[in-house]
Amino acid sequence: MALNVFQKQEVVKELAGVATKAHSLIVAEYAGITVPQMTAMRKQARESGVYLKVVKNKLAARALGDTEYAVIKEKLIGPLLYAFSLEDPGAAGRLIKEFSKKHDKLKSKAVSLGGVLYPAGHVDVLASLPTRLQALAMLARVLSEPVTLFARAIKAMADDKSETFAVSSPETSEA
């Protein structure tokens, strides 16, 4: 379906708005993916906080032109799918990686994070990033570790003193 000028402007405006809020962008080739497979992927994307869109490359280049994702313009060749991580930086990476395991037709083409263009192989790195909740749990564990070690040391010292006192008490009473 051909879009008129006003519809194209709306698409560019929408994509630019999403790009300014997104943490990361993955561009992937989707040629050969069936409609039911794409529908399942879109459903999975909505559930994981990923904005998934198939847009003409010319419109995408215009939309991304004034954002940190302008670095990806040189990779916009052929039919592409744009996956923006809205909630955490690794969400789109996990989605694309998981979906491409089941469907070999989906191939990542480029990754952009923080205004830097990375090769397609960096999808695995992006997918391995912890979610916000996982990162907070790791931070809490790291912060609580010294306190836990200190408490264990105090307990061990108290146990040693009580054992020493229990062992030395009978000897002193005999002497």
Swiss-Prot record:
Cellular component annotations (GO), alphabetically ordered: large ribosomal subunit
Pfam families reported in the protein's UniProt record: Ribosomal_L10
GO molecular function: large ribosomal subunit rRNA binding; structural constituent of ribosome
Entry keywords, A to Z: Ribonucleoprotein, Ribosomal protein, RNA-binding, rRNA-binding
Top-level taxon: Bacteria
InterPro entries: Ribosomal_uL10 (IPR001790), Ribosomal_uL10-like_sf (IPR043141), Ribosomal_uL10_bac (IPR022973), Ribosomal_uL10_bac_type (IPR047865), Ribosomal_uL10_CS_bac (IPR002363)
GO annotation, biological process: translation
Known role: Forms part of the ribosomal stalk, playing a central role in the interaction of the ribosome with GTP-bound translation factors.
UniProt subunit comment: Part of the ribosomal stalk of the 50S ribosomal subunit. The N-terminus interacts with L11 and the large rRNA to form the base of the stalk. The C-terminus forms an elongated spine to which L12 dimers bind in a sequential fashion forming a multimeric L10(L12)X complex.
Family of the protein in this entry: Belongs to the universal ribosomal protein uL10 family.
The protein's name: Large ribosomal subunit protein uL10
Protein species of origin: Xylella fastidiosa (strain Temecula1 / ATCC 700964)
Gene name linked to the record: rplJ
